[in-house]
């Protein structure tokens, strides 16, 4: 048997924590006098770093911007972090775990934090829909592959 077959996958959540929070309502109180028909923009980003053998930090950054016309009603950003033990996998499987599986675990915590901040700002309730991090990760891989193909084509 090869050594790879003897290695079992290990996954454990060590800690989930809020790394950074920001809430701004730059046009308050004037924005409260307007009819609430906001345009809501959601931006997501993930980053991961290896802390030790098989131990990784994954940070999910969720930014929500609500605008009324040209004015920003509020801007809310949460960086939700997690420390995970991930062993027995490498390459694309590890990248998928850190880029999709772990952010999927972190998102409900970030969503709850954003909902709470928006509510404390006395804005109407904001319900963020679930995010398909697997699809986002697959799109990212496809863009990377297309980018490499274009770079190789230019070098030829």
From Swiss-Prot:
Recorded superkingdom: Bacteria
Pfam families for the chain: SecB
InterPro entries to which the protein is assigned, alphabetical: SecB (IPR003708), SecB-like_sf (IPR035958)
One GO CC annotation: cytoplasm
Keywords annotated in UniProt: Chaperone, Cytoplasm, Protein transport, Translocation, Transport
Protein's GO biological process: protein folding; protein tetramerization; protein transport
Main location: cytoplasm
Molecular function as annotated in GO: unfolded protein binding
Localisation per UniProt entry: Cytoplasm
Oligomeric and partner information: Homotetramer, a dimer of dimers. One homotetramer interacts with 1 SecA dimer.
Role noted for this protein: One of the proteins required for the normal export of preproteins out of the cell cytoplasm. It is a molecular chaperone that binds to a subset of precursor proteins, maintaining them in a translocation-competent state. It also specifically binds to its receptor SecA.
Entry similarity comment: Belongs to the SecB family.
Protein name, UniProt field: Protein-export protein SecB
Source organism (scientific name): Pectobacterium carotovorum subsp. carotovorum (strain PC1)
Recorded name of the encoding gene: secB
